[in-house]
């Protein structure tokens, strides 16, 4: 039995990640695919993250970084098991978000990546570009919904994309929604059909 593919959607806040994930979920047989999003706010770490994001509690940046990382590690075994059972996972945010947001706040990218080292490695990361309209919508109640901060996050994403050690697909914000939907669906289907070998380890 061939394994499932680990496909991650990344991008700035309000870039359309969840919408595109749901489009994929509707396009592929339900018995072969599952959706997972981070942070998972139902766990102990997730509830602490939710309190932080919604400004109910404050933590120093190092603690916040570790909380987000721990939240992903809580699901590392689940991800590995699902992939080995032939289930493809569509993941809304992953380690790259954690590293980009931490680095945008001044943390060492190298150190932040070391916390995530060993997580299941994605077979494909789809990065949704944000147009000026989407970026300017980044004003909201949660702590990271700030235009200036989101621009910093974007620069950190670009650094990771340029490293070339991960298979990234950048989706332009210039595409019409129906074109974007079809393009992403085709990219995902190809990734599922061409995945080979054991699940890799991220940043090892």
From Swiss-Prot:
What is the recorded function of this protein according to its Swiss-Prot or TrEMBL entry? Poxvirus TMP kinase is able to phosphorylate dTMP, dUMP and also dGMP from any purine and pyrimidine nucleoside triphosphate. The large substrate specificity is explained by the presence of a canal connecting the edge of the dimer interface to the TMP base binding pocket, canal not found in the human homolog.
Instruction: Report the family membership.
Output: Belongs to the thymidylate kinase family.
Q: Which GO terms describe its molecular function?
A: ATP binding; dTMP kinase activity; nucleoside diphosphate kinase activity
| EC identifiers of the protein | 2.7.4.9
Q: What Pfam families does the database record attribute to this sequence?
A: Thymidylate_kin
Quaternary structure note? Homodimer; the dimer arrangement is orthogonal and not antiparallel as in human enzyme.
The GO annotation for biological process reads: dTDP biosynthetic process; dTTP biosynthetic process; dUDP biosynthetic process
Q: Which PANTHER family match?
A: THYMIDYLATE KINASE
Protein name, as recorded: Thymidylate kinase
Pathway field of the UniProt record reads: Pyrimidine metabolism; dTTP biosynthesis
> Which keywords appear in this protein's UniProt record, sorted alphabetically?
ATP-binding, Early protein, Kinase, Nucleotide biosynthesis, Nucleotide-binding, Transferase
Its induction note reads:
Expressed in the early phase of the viral replicative cycle.
Q: InterPro entries, per this entry?
A: P-loop_NTPase, Thymidylate_kin-like_dom, Thymidylate_kin_CS, Thymidylate_kinase
> What catalytic reaction does the record list?
dTMP + ATP = dTDP + ADP
């Amino acid at each position: 039995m061939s394994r499932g593919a680990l496909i991650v959607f990344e991008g700035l806040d309000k870039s359309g990640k969840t919408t595109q994930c749901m489009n994929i979920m509707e396009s592929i047989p339900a018995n072969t695919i599952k959706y997972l999003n981070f942070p998972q706010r139902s766990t102990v770490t997730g509830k602490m993250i939710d309190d932080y994001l919604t400004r109910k509690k404050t933590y120093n940046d190092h603690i916040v970084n570790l909380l987000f990382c721990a939240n992903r590690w809580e699901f590392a075994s689940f991800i590995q098991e699902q992939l080995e059972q032939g289930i493809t996972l569509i993941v809304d945010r992953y380690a790259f978000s954690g590293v980009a947001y931490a680095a945008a706040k001044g943390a060492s990218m190298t150190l932040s990546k070391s916390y995530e080292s060993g997580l299941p490695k994605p077979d494909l990361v789809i990065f949704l570009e944000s147009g000026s309209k989407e970026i300017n919508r980044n004003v909201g109640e949660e702590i990271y919904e700030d235009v200036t901060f989101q621009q910093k996050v974007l620069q950190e994403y670009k650094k990771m994309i340029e490293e070339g050690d991960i298979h990234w697909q950048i989706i332009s914000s210039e595409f019409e929604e129906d074109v974007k939907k079809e393009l992403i669906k085709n990219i995902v289907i190809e990734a599922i059909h061409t995945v080979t070998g054991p699940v890799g380890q991220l940043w090892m």
